[in-house]
Amino acid sequence: MIESIVILVSALREELEQYGEMLALLDRQQQQVIARAADEVFQSIGLIKSQGVAIQTARARREVCRASVAKDLLQSEHAPFADLIPLLPADYQPLMKALVEENNELLVRVRQRARQNHLLLSRSMELMQGLINTLFPARETRVYNGLGVMNVHGLRTRAVYEAVG
């Protein structure tokens, strides 16, 4: 049983490391968005996706290890950490509790930062769309009617020189 606990501790540490890496990538992306470094923001998307895969892998490994410890403790393989930690040897309880709490806290921070970045990127897109619409007015407007159906209204197109002059 001790061996499976040690493996679970290792898996929790790995998961914690992966969340930390993701938070660092999201922090960097946020700085790049604020600095309007479009190329760097674009490159960060691939890194963030790769890190998301690494997190999923670490999470899956941790779940397998948790199920193994649960089985060793004669519990359901779906037993949550809250049920398992009190059943662990006393020497491992504080460590396991701390790792689980740190993972949960870091996950919350990662989610918050991802939401912040999403809002920043969405706002940047809205501003850019507004600029494009001022430079090149749409040939049609889309408006929802009272029934929630989108109506399309055509506009007279103007040549660029007419819009400028």
List PLM regions with ranges:
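Short terminal interaction segments
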Residues: P80-G165
